[in-house]
Amino acid sequence: MSKSLQAIRGMNDILPEQTPAWRYLERTFAGLLDGYGYSEIRLPILEFTELFARGIGEGTDVVDKEMYTFLDRNGESLTMRPEGTAGCVRAVLEHGLSGGGQVQKLWYTGPMFRYEKPQKGRYRQFHQIGVEVFNLPGPDIDAELIILTWRLWQKLGMADAVTLQLNTLGSSEARARYREALVAYLQERFEQLDEDSQRRMTTNPLRILDSKVESTQALLVGAPTLHDYLDEESIAHFEGLKARLDAVGLRYEINQKLVRGLDYYCRTAFEWVTDKLGAQGTVCGGGRYDGLVSQFGGKPTPGVGFAMGVERLVLLLETLGVIPAELNRPADLYVCAFGEPAELAALTLAEQLRSAIPGIRLLVNAGAGSFKSQFKKADKSGARFALILGEDEVANRVVGFKPLRDEGEQQSIAWDALPEHLAACLAQA
């Protein structure tokens, strides 16, 4: 017996009862971004592997362990995008969008792919909403991005469930000095480090700060801190950011171990975290990447952005119980028709009602069936009202109009009067 077909592990179907919450989140965010003057960009899922090797960084877990990479028929190494920033930077460079210092404020959404161990809130195909800004070097735009996310949490009813963690990673020179000091400190304790941290000593030692292993965190208690090695310009940038967040009353925590998982970040780094989802607590993260464009061969261009995980945000909305009930509202009207003339009349009336009452949720019975079976389907649909059309109704140009959710009596309504009558009934809800 052949194996039944099923989805690949960690790549999930989003079923009809789940999609309203996704659409709600995406619509809310798109509307918010439009109000802030951001433009959508749509990016390909496949990119040349070199893009991520250069952008994310050799030696990172993403590049070394997690990317879906393959050779195409021309022998080119291609990768399914594990994140969105590198592809967005590539598009900005390729199409000259940042030339002449022009400011670009962009956003995108779509699936990303990483070969990780699937668990609640962490999948191999996952979806992100990302925002990237180019050619604005100051802390004011960093603050705008963070405030924008804060406003989104307020709109979604989850502001009290998330906490902003903030850090500065300084300049590349400051990080190089700090890296040297951190490596010297940890080298003396190398045998006590966990296996992953030992590997990171030669590839990306700053990521050791973010280790989830308790024994490694205990070793870091006496380690030098990045803030002791910061340059004056980075300190001023960070103070400017904090002043702006303070001005709008946005609370935050300084987390000196927050380094983010990708090599391209500098100066500002931030995450929004929650304690409502267990181990998968980060719902949004980002920061500044002023050197990334030049890494790809472009002129030095300031950049800053963030990405948020849609699956985790939807999971958090469900956990908090703040998904609006009206997202899953049933149909307003179910049209039952008996006989071919009635079916043709039902189709015509339905389209007239859709034109007359924008936003109406109207179902027309398909597949014929007896009066009893159609009424059963009307009731199961959850519709508030049913329209009934048979030979007599068509001959007299009327419909039977029956409430399905209260004790109201069935009425006979002329076709011409139906839009006004139905609109009045719907308005009474």
From Swiss-Prot:
Stored PROSITE patterns: AA_TRNA_LIGASE_II (PS50862)
This protein's record includes keyword ATP-binding: yes
Reactions catalysed, as given in the entry: tRNA(His) + L-histidine + ATP = L-histidyl-tRNA(His) + AMP + diphosphate + H(+)
Gene Ontology terms describing biological process: histidyl-tRNA aminoacylation
Class of enzymatic activity (EC top level): ligase
UniProt keywords, alphabetically: Aminoacyl-tRNA synthetase, ATP-binding, Cytoplasm, Ligase, Nucleotide-binding, Protein biosynthesis
Location in the cell: Cytoplasm
One GO MF term: ATP binding
GO cellular component labels: cytoplasm
EC number of this enzyme: 6.1.1.21
InterPro entries the record matches: aa-tRNA-synth_II, aa-tRNA-synth_II/BPL/LPL, Anticodon-bd, Anticodon-bd_dom_sf, His-tRNA-ligase, HisRS-like_core, HisRS/HisZ, HisRS_anticodon
Family: Belongs to the class-II aminoacyl-tRNA synthetase family.
Xref: NCBIfam families: hisS
Subunit structure: Homodimer.
Name of the protein: Histidine--tRNA ligase
Gene: hisS
